[in-house]
Amino acid sequence: MAKARSRSAATEPAPGYANVPSAGNSGPTVPFCQGSKPETEIAYSWAKIEPSANAQVLGPIALPANGYVRNVWIEVETTTKGKEEAATIAEDMPFSIFEQIKLTEPNGAPLGMEMRGFSAYIANTLGAYAGSPYIENQIEFNKGLNEPRFAIRVPVELTPNGLGALGNQSASAALRLTLTVAPLGPAYYSAGKYEAGKVPQFTIRVIMELWGEPPERDILGRAVQQSPPFEGTAQYWSEQPSVTINKGLNQTRITRVGSMIRTLAFVFRETGVRKEGDKVANTGASNLQVQWDNRVFRTQTPFYNWQSQQEMVERIKERKKGVYWFCFSQGENRHAGEPGINSWLATLTSTRLELLNTAENAGTVDILVNDVSVTAINPLERTQQIGVGGYHPPVGQVSNVAA
């Protein structure tokens, strides 16, 4: 009689599965973005929001404690149409409906974004996070005064594999979102007004895009990476608003340094209105230059700058008057926003970073900086200082029969 062959650890099925390798011979670790799955969750909504003479602060709201935040989607729908009276729509509409969009740590420290609505539009478009990032291509987009309709994201994740996604598993230490609706006036129209009692009403919805918490092992018993790649990496969008541009030579200091810069954008204005002369912006300057420490390393004509937007931002239809950028995230496919870590601009807190231009007229410039921090901090310190996310509190073991 033949002797029965014993079953080794390599052939023994994992508990709960038939003919599945055990955890002891599981092979390589499964990447986070394969073990986890993208999810969405309604975070909050406000109904019957009607602009008035005063700004309206909505929030702060705590994002639902769930997984790792990828982005925060903010959707504006007109539920009661308005009726304007000989009004001329403001050039930054409909994005200027938001006087401020702010994502923060539990203690109020800025995290991810803190800027005005139009600046957030620039961040979405020139930051190039979506496959087609030009917001005005949205299927429901409407910029009209009487029935605006659009959506805008607070970008958190840098690349679709989870890089930059922020842990948000604790309800007592959740990320917070605050929206400020602009008062009636220049944010909506440059002339005219709404008829009395005919101001539109909005519903504003917030959807959290996230990665779910992955199981410790997959169905084949392989170990799954439990957090996004390079956990602790975080990006920020910040704004230096209304910096004075004088007639003549300007050397304007960019104050947000100390991390790796992914995108720089500039919005030139004259008396609050985006404007450009025959050459560049409201100032009529012949070139835009960026000085990095002791050398000028980017010099561009206006046409070159505008053309780079068209070439690198997928399906962009038109450039915005007075808006210029310098991209440090061009990927191998020649598009902005792709993995291009080698092109991020490294800075120190002592780095001299300046915008140089010669102005024919005085005005202002809004400086938008998208920088990436790659230094993780102790999760216990997350609510005590300006952190970089990656919070992962102690939790029970994930239930999985193959563990």
What are these regions (language model features)?
Residues 2-403:
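Short, low-complexity Pro/Thr/Gly
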